[in-house]
């Protein structure tokens, strides 16, 4: 697991209050991890802060799974 992947997973655990074992790459924040719309906004904000980047709203809407969050940070962070 890469450092970025590990950091993204830790943010998800902290923001959504889930166990690390639940944070699988294919897991949907809403369907699998129980996030609501406010949780997803806060998650994106936490990613922006951790990786010192700004995620435009249209891109943030596409970040719906653990893997999509990792991919975004790897490609744009």
UniProtKB/Swiss-Prot annotation:
Keyword flag DNA repair: no
Modified residues (O-(pantetheine 4'-phosphoryl)serine): 37
Single GO BP term: lipid A biosynthetic process
Signal peptide: none
GO MF annotation, one: acyl carrier activity
Localisation: Cytoplasm
GO CC terms: cytosol; membrane
Pathway assigned to this chain's UniProt record: Lipid metabolism; fatty acid biosynthesis
PTM entry text: 4'-phosphopantetheine is transferred from CoA to a specific serine of apo-ACP by AcpS. This modification is essential for activity because fatty acids are bound in thioester linkage to the sulfhydryl of the prosthetic group.
Domain Carrier: 2-77
UniProt keywords, alphabetically: Cytoplasm, Fatty acid biosynthesis, Fatty acid metabolism, Lipid biosynthesis, Lipid metabolism, Phosphopantetheine, Phosphoprotein
Pfam families reported in the protein's UniProt record: PP-binding
Similarity field: Belongs to the acyl carrier protein (ACP) family.
Alphabetical list of HAMAP family matching this protein: Acyl_carrier
Job of this protein: Carrier of the growing fatty acid chain in fatty acid biosynthesis.
Listed PANTHER family: ACYL CARRIER PROTEIN, CARRIER DOMAIN-CONTAINING PROTEIN
Protein name: Acyl carrier protein
Underlying gene: acpP
């Amino acid at each position: 697991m890469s450092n970025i992947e590990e950091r993204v997973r830790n943010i998800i655990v902290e923001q959504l209050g889930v166990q690390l074992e639940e944070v699988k790459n294919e897991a949907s924040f809403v369907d699998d991890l129980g996030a609501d719309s406010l949780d997803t906004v806060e998650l994106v904000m936490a990613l922006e802060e951790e990786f010192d980047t700004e995620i435009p709203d249209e891109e943030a809407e596409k970040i719906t799974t653990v893997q999509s969050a990792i991919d975004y940070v790897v490609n744009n962070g």
